[in-house]
Amino acid sequence: MVMEVGILDAGGLRALLRERAAQCLLLDCRSFFAFNAGHIVGSVNVRFSTIVRRRAKGAMGLEHIVPNTELRGRLLAGAYHAVVLLDERSAALDGAKRDGTLALAAGALCREARSTQVFFLQGGYEAFSASCPELCSKQSTPMGLSLPLSTSVPDSAESGCSSCSTPLYDQGGPVEILSFLYLGSAYHASRKDMLDALGITALINVSANCPNHFEGHYQYKSIPVEDNHKADISSWFNEAIDFIDSIKDAGGRVFVHCQAGISRSATICLAYLMRTNRVKLDEAFEFVKQRRSIISPNFSFMGQLLQFESQVLAPHCSAEAGSPAMAVLDRGTSTTTVFNFPVSIPVHPTNSALNYLQSPITTSPSC
């Protein structure tokens, strides 16, 4: 199919942004992971699930390309002078996969936004960031805040180590998941200097027994769940996500913690990424793990996240997206794989359900 898409190089886009930035819509067709690692300032990440892609059969609707109602309304009203599509490094649109995000986005725009000129960025983000780094935003190295730690460890943080050492999950500081979302342990939540240095304005305490140390200084949200295979953490997902969004919309930052910042709080962060960015669990897991390598939601929480994935990515396609987590509970199933992530709580299922796991189950302190 011949599509009326113009070509811009890095210099052309730079000139366009300097002259008419407010009338230029940048649609970044790379993965969520790549987009968050670095992107052109003001660009919007285009993502949709595999099931939505398959059901579209090559003709994706504009509501999937630009899900934001306000942006889509402006686009259809002709408020944008130009829409620029980009991927990582493609030299030409002709080389894009026919069922790939870039080609589907171009097709939808040419069909439904005919009043706006559509361009393809030659060389993609890679070429533009090399030529115009000042117009790009790159995430800093995913490490926690480096502040001096006291030699004493709170009684609530059992380390299993000598009394004079700091457990791994309390070392460093809270890690940045997104610019407004941080993850860490109960110890970090007790360090007002760390929280203030990061600009934290609210905390989500995902535990039944960790205290809220500074209720007069920060806004708190309590999610009183235990870290065991009986706990229903998924019933809190939407409430936690809405809380995070409310703090973000107010210009604040949220720190999510449990006891060790390994299982419960990590689960909440994963659920947030999955729903708000429409990404699969494995992609969200890898994204968070690169920032806090010790995350390890327990077996049950992983199952609940998989069920949440099927709801988030295909709300109207439940028959096609049944949760693999249910395979573990169905004694008659022949499924051989559930997920490939380490989990923190040892599970003792019946009927040889352990055979479904490809990764070893590790143990850790209550987290």
Swiss-Prot record:
PROSITE patterns: RHODANESE_3, TYR_PHOSPHATASE_1, TYR_PHOSPHATASE_2, TYR_PHOSPHATASE_DUAL
Alphabetized UniProt keyword annotations: Cell cycle, Hydrolase, Nucleus, Phosphoprotein, Protein phosphatase, Ubl conjugation
Maturation and modification: Phosphorylation at Ser-359 and Ser-364 by MAPK1/ERK2 and MAPK3/ERK1 reduces its rate of degradation.
Catalytic residues as annotated in Swiss-Prot or TrEMBL: C258
GO biological process: cellular response to chemokine; cellular response to hormone stimulus; endoderm formation; intracellular signal transduction; negative regulation of apoptotic process; negative regulation of cell adhesion; negative regulation of cell population proliferation; negative regulation of DNA biosynthetic process
Keyword Hydrolase included in the entry's annotation: yes
Record function comment: Dual specificity phosphatase that dephosphorylates MAP kinase MAPK1/ERK2 on both 'Thr-183' and 'Tyr-185', regulating its activity during the meiotic cell cycle.
Stated family: Belongs to the protein-tyrosine phosphatase family. Non-receptor class dual specificity subfamily.
Protein name: Dual specificity protein phosphatase 1
Source organism of this protein record: Rattus norvegicus (Rat)
